[in-house]
Amino acid sequence: MNKELLTKPFKKEQIKNREGRQGMIYYYITISDVIDRINQACDSVQIIVKEKEIYESEVIVLITLNLDGETKESFGSSMINGSIGDALKSAHSDALKKAAWLFGVPCIFNTTTEPEIDNGQGNVGFRCSV
């Protein structure tokens, strides 16, 4: 596992944002960028869906992420706003990002200000708790 690559801040163009409730701006990294980072930094990647629960208005997924023999688990959830399949996909992405964050991938931001980014000079990116 290349820990330096795994924990490297993402480039500014990789940090997306969307408007949420009450006009708040949420910053995020796409799941494809998170998966690309994991695949580049690790020789062996295994993702296992251990549990999934479908409720009336929400789905919850528990995944295990194994990177080069080291394992982390995380839950993800999503409201059902359309199809159950879309909600499961969203919950899986949520769980995978949270598990990746446990390995040090800087992919979760709990802030209302723009996160710090990689400026090419070795600055450490913004990280926070889930």
Model feature map: region roles:
Residues 24, 29-125:
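Positively charged, aromatic-enriched nucleic acid-contacting surfaces
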Residues 130:
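Accessory terminal regions of nucleic-acid processing enzymes
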Residues 1-28:
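N-terminal, Lys/Arg- and Ser/Thr-rich interaction peptides
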